[in-house]
């Protein structure tokens, strides 16, 4: 009887991310923007574990250019009510800095003022964020309850590990 040598078979389990969250070239531009502009006064005090973000590219106003949501989810950017999210245009110019947000974020196909309606759950109820005068409302906790109890079945779900897992980048 001849025994064949045992072969180790390595299985590589690769994370599956939503494609709108994976763009290493864009991530490098975002890192530069965060370090040299948006967080330039904070960067020296940020711990290594706080230097993480996720992003999601989506065209909110049908202009053919993706806006970019940046999700800050580490301790430095989060408080008891939620975390900071940033919305940038395609040129990395700020549109809205959201405070106290707890993803997932729902982007509806319905538009108001030419931009997608956003929904976020806050204190157990959905809040509608509508674009007005160049930005979205920055603090959903002060908004009234949305006129409906759930997002539509057509909403795009952002920053959800179940529906749109986002790649984590460090800077």
What spans do the regions from the language model cover?
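Acidic/hydrophobic-patterned starts of short beta strands in beta-sheet-rich repeat architectures
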Residues: 62-73, 112-120
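Short consensus segments that form the blades of beta-propeller domains
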Residues: 44-46, 75-80
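Acidic, small-residue rich beta-repeat scaffolds with periodic aromatic anchors
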Residues: 1-25, 108-171
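Short, flexible beta-strand-to-coil junctions
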Residues: 72-76, 90-92, 120-125
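Flexible low-complexity loop/turn motifs enriched in small/helix-breaking residues
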Residues: 2-60, 65, 166-171
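Beta-propeller blade repeat segments, especially FG-GAP/WD-type strand-to-loop junctions
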Residues: 16-27, 31, 80-97, 128-135
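A short, surface-exposed interaction/processing loop segment used at functional sites
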Residues: 86-104, 139-147
């Amino acid at each position: 009887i001849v025994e064949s040598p045992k072969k180790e078979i390595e299985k590589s389990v690769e994370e599956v991310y939503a494609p709108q969250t994976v763009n290493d070239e864009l991530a490098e531009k975002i890192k530069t923007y965060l370090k040299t502009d948006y967080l330039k006064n904070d960067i020296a005090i940020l711990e290594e574990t706080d230097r993480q973000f996720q992003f999601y590219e989506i065209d909110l106003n049908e202009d053919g250019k993706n806006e970019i949501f940046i999700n800050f989810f580490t301790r430095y950017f989060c408080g008891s009510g939620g975390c900071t999210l940033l919305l940038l245009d395609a040129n990395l110019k700020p549109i809205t800095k959201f405070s106290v947000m707890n993803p997932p974020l729902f982007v509806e196909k319905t538009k108001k003022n030419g931009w997608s309606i956003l929904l976020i759950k806050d204190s157990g109820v959905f809040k509608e964020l509508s674009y007005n005068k160049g930005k979205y409302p920055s603090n959903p906790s002060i908004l009234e309850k949305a006129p409906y109890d759930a997002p539509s079945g057509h909403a795009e779900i952002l920053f959800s590990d179940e529906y749109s897992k986002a790649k984590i980048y460090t800077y």
